[in-house]
Amino acid sequence: MDEPESESPASILASVRAQEAQFELLSRALEEERRHVTAQLDRVWVTPQEPPLANGSLTRRQQDGLPFLYTPTRMEAHSVHADERYVIDDSSYKSCTLTDESRCSEIPIQTVVGYSQTLDRPYREAAGSGGAYTTVPRNYHFRGPGVDSTMPLISQSPHPGYSSLSRPNQRYRSVDPFRGPGYGPQPQVRGGGLGGSQSDLLSGRIYGSEDAYGLEDDRRSLGGFIDGPDYATTGRRGANGGDPRRRLRSYEDPLSDHFGSIPTSGSLSSLGPAPLTLAPNSGPWRHPELPEVLAMLSYTLDAVRLNAAAYLQHLSYRNEDVKREVCRLRGIPPLISLLEDPRAPIRLAACGALKNLSYGPARENKMAVKNCDGVPALARLLRRRGEGIEGRELAECVTGTLWNLSSLDSVKMELVDQALYTLTQEILVPHSGWQQDGGMQDRVEGKPRHVEWEPALVNTTGCLRNISSERSEARRKMRECEGLVDSVVHILRSEVSHGLVDSKLLENVVCLLRNISYHVHREIPHAEKYMESPQNASAETQNPSCFGVRRGKGKKASEEAVDTVDFPKQTMPAQGYDLLFQPEIVRLYISLVKSSHTPAVLEASAGAIQNLCAGNWVYGRCIRAAVRQEKGLSSLADHLTHESERVVRAICGALRNLCGDNRNRELIGKHALNSLVARLSSSSAQSSALSEDTNVCVINTIHEVISGNLEAAKRLRESQGIERLVLINKGGGRSEREIRAAGFCLQTIWGYKELRRPLEKDGWKKSDFQVSTAATSSVQGYDDSTLPLIDRNLKNEKKSVNADIPLNDFIADQFTHNGDSSNRLPTRSDELSELDPLKECSVSAGGSLNLGDAEDQRV
């Protein structure tokens, strides 16, 4: 504008200020007009039959001789045009009145669809300005009345937040070099003004609610001026926002806006948590889909990987469908790779996700972890866990994951080979309180040493408990692992001394000791030097007439003279696997039988005694006598009435192996036989309250007690045990195993000549005491090998087989054993031997138990 030289600087300044005020008002009006038009356009359904604009530019109508002109050439220099443009001639106008010193004008706007705009940049509000608005585009020219046509354009000074708008074309994709691939996961950013920062995310902060697992763009600047496209959540700039353009995914319609808009504060969204007033299903952003979460595990930004792993842990919590889908989408490998991440919070979040994914009966995820070398990766993570609370939390998570993995048979040997030594040396030995010099260091600052580490110890012993039910090679490696048996026995001693006889840690420890005691008399080094010959002469078993009163009394007199326990002398304190069969460990087992109320602890304690008493070896003979001297026989017999059948079966197995000592057999017949008979059903019409396995165990124990014990056989007759056995032998819906066991027990009773006449007076016949023909003639594909079954007419009799059953996992399987399964009819006087593991289908008390599902952890 040309001004006379005579005018004062004050008048020039006043004129400039007036023009600036007018320009500001005009800018506000234009911004309001643009927003209104955009809102109308987004509500219009565009049809391809409408005629396009010929000139490719906008048309503005003129009123009162006040034109507003677009310059198409200038616009095209900054714009990406839509392919087709349509005008909806609805004669609708929106006018705005501007008042200044010179003239009042109205600006009519025609409703336009598919107009062209330039690529936008986010507007940053200047300090002290009145509000957040976008400046008028640079290609608008204003001419007012009384102003010379050569008046220079009033130009807004360049502002970092300067912005103009662009409507994306169909399937719009930015060609900027920093834009990620279209098929990749899209970042999600919260609304502005929330106070988050990059330092908060990189320090490992996880937001408090599940809505806070927003996924940030790793290429987005976190502060300051951005001279480029605005990265915002899909749908942030919609019909009501200041920017109609939004970033599109490959499956979205570029002309449809389904989400409301939340303007950003300045040019960027805050990376902080969600505002408390925001509903989870409101419009700012959507929850990421599972494939997107899995893709985010490989993002370059630490905060994205951290939130993705934590969110995946949340999604997989008690959700079997998500676990299967993660396995199908190959989500396990990126999680395992995150275990090597240099940042501890990311490692913890990834391990927590693996912990949840590996929980449950499904085996696919467990196998995927194994096949991706997840077990050695977890072992390495345990070794590099660090110190302090963070290190302890990571140790708990890693050991919990290993415990979950150990419930699958095909992973157990992998754990033995890759994680056994690490678990022992990193967790069990240093935190159990045991010292290699034999000292006791149970307390630190007034607490038992292992209390703070008890969760990690529980997980570790749970994992070892599961893998100890694997084959003999696993048991051998565990017995010979330096410090393992010593630490476990020390924990057992400490728990019993503190009265913690029902804790989960104690349960795992006792089950572990029971399992590694299985076949201990055969599998320890130099086992042959501990072997003994059978106590009873072989001639006793060949003739039924040998079961006489005089022979029984003779054995009793000979055994009463020797009722002492002579454990082998040792020059050095026992350590390692030698601790498994020492008198101290036997006393601990008996103490648990007397004081514990946990079925799993009772079962494991009785099973450990059963394993140690099996076989003809020096320590087996000494332990049978030690149990008697410690009053353990009566304590075991008291649990025959326990409500848990697993406990009853374990007690029966222990009593049967303890009957290898003739003095024990007499005492058990005197004090426990009535309880055994009471567990049998008293009516053939009434179905037994016990399962088939439990009934067979009870009958087999009765058989072992009355073998060579006339007084016990008489007591069985007086307690109506014969009636119950005959009912079972006659059938009445009983299984073949029950009928066969009852038949051989009755045959043993009829073998006592002293009892035949009283039995005949009671109305019994010889046929009532014979083994069922159907039971003996059929091929036995499934044989109860826990009892030495007696068939005196069978030649080539086999050795007796007494049960020695370690805890195993809950996967159902048949009862397996070594050797031939058919016609296993051994005698009572031969060697006490053992069987392979019995696999049960009970989850509550089995040897292999899953760890409880991990709660969402604050990482």
Swiss-Prot record:
GO terms for molecular function: cadherin binding. Residues 226-254 are annotated as: Disordered. Ubiquitously expressed. It is found in: Cell junction, Adherens junction; Cytoplasm; Nucleus; Cell membrane. Gene3D superfamilies: Leucine-rich Repeat Variant. Residues 243-254 have a biased composition (Basic and acidic residues). It holds the Pfam family Arm. ARM repeats lie at residues 279-317, 320-359, 363-401, 402-446, 464-503, 513-552, 574-614, 621-660, 661-700, 701-746. One of its GO terms (biological process) is cranial skeletal system development. Residues 15-44 form a coiled coil. The keyword Nucleus applies. Its main location: other. Belongs to the beta-catenin family. Key regulator of cell-cell adhesion that associates with and regulates the cell adhesion properties of both C-, E- and N-cadherins, being critical for their surface stability. Beside cell-cell adhesion, regulates gene transcription through several transcription factors including ZBTB33/Kaiso2 and GLIS2, and the activity of Rho family GTPases and downstream cytoskeletal dynamics. Implicated both in cell transformation by SRC and in ligand-induced receptor signaling through the EGF, PDGF, CSF-1 and ERBB2 receptors. Interacts with C-cadherin and with zbtb33. This is Catenin delta-1. It comes from Xenopus laevis.
